[in-house]
Amino acid sequence: MKIIGHRIGGNIVSDKSSRFGDVFNPATGEVESKIALASIPDVDKAVNAAKKALPVWSETPPIQRARILFKYKQLIEENIDELADLVGREHGKTLADAKGSVVRGLEVVEFACGIPHLLKGEFTEQVGTGVDSFSIRQPVGIAAGITPFNFPAMVPLWMYPIAIACGNTFILKPSERDPSCPIRLTELLEEAGAPAGVLNVVNGDKEAVNAILDHPDISAVSFVGSTPVAKHVYSRGSLSGKRVQALGGAKNHMVIMPDADLDQAVDALMGAAYGSAGERCMAISVAVAVGDVGDKLIEKIAPKVSSLKVGPWDDPEAEMGPIVTKESLDRITTLIGEGEKAGAELVVDGRNLKLQGYENGNFIGGTLFAVSYTHLTLPTNREV
């Protein structure tokens, strides 16, 4: 079976790992590969590689770093189908959704290509008698990024292109559920001309995260994920003096007023609620219908939810793919059952969906509740 190792200093490394996890294909429910889970020595090795690359990279002229990023942008565009397939195969997103997420990340690479202008300092003459003032922008050193499962291409691309464009080196800890796309993105950056060690990938769980947060040679950490983990990253990382950015989760509602264009509202709601199987912080999980618009809304949206085309990532007709893990699927079906028990009307029940040839996949159909003010438990549950 394929072993997914860490990418450190331009090489795939797994021989020092004593712990391994499973990477599943959520459409089939089968183990696609084994992944090496980093411990402290693995993180130390990545830090040493980043430290070795830092002097040369930080002294590389910004315009030269930008040229490498322009080439990187080109390589991502040329390999976008492969990258989207890696995302879909391990996360479950439809190929169209996966490709769109790569494109959103690519926009940050394009922004990073303009870094020479953004790195200009400031100079002010005579701020006081005989006193001039100036500021310069310099790399902070080694930065790290800890990213979630739901956007294995887009969120890493939010982070490291800017960091490395500014002359820093970087250590990425992607989700252990879908690591292949981040590793491939690292290979493409090296192919574009970035020296080995500028971008390193360590796979792992909480042990790897804590090793990154505690390491004295890592100067900055960025995180995107759930709110409890964001609090942990912020508190533990800042203890050692790191610059920490921690973006927690979100809970989104759509409010539909009585004078709304319901056709437009339904189209927007279908994409926002069921895109990426709802596994994103931008997802709409609750729509608040004001006044008497609720019944009209249900009448219009229920047929669309019922006919939502669910399928594997590589089905070009699929509108929604599987849930990323069996555990997440079980949690969702449990919440649906709890909603029923609380008295909410289950208008469309997507449970127990089985697709021919994918009977072991983590699939659930579109599901729709109608909830009145007397049954508010479901829409106020943070887990929904």
Place the predicted regions along the sequence by residue.
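N-terminal Rossmann-like NAD(P)+-binding subdomain of aldehyde/semialdehyde dehydrogenases
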Residues: 1-131, 324
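Hydrophobic face of alpha-helices
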Residues: 47, 66-73, 84, 102, ...
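Structural signal for hydrophobic packing residues in well-ordered secondary-structure cores
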Residues: 54, 58, 73-80, 84, ...
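Residue-level signal for inorganic ion chemistry
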Residues: 29, 65, 87, 109, ...
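Conserved small/polar residues in nucleotide/adenosyl-binding loops
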Residues: 374-380
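Rossmann-like NAD(P) dinucleotide-binding subdomain of oxidoreductase/dehydrogenase enzymes
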Residues: 121-264
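ALDH superfamily catalytic-core signature
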Residues: 228-373
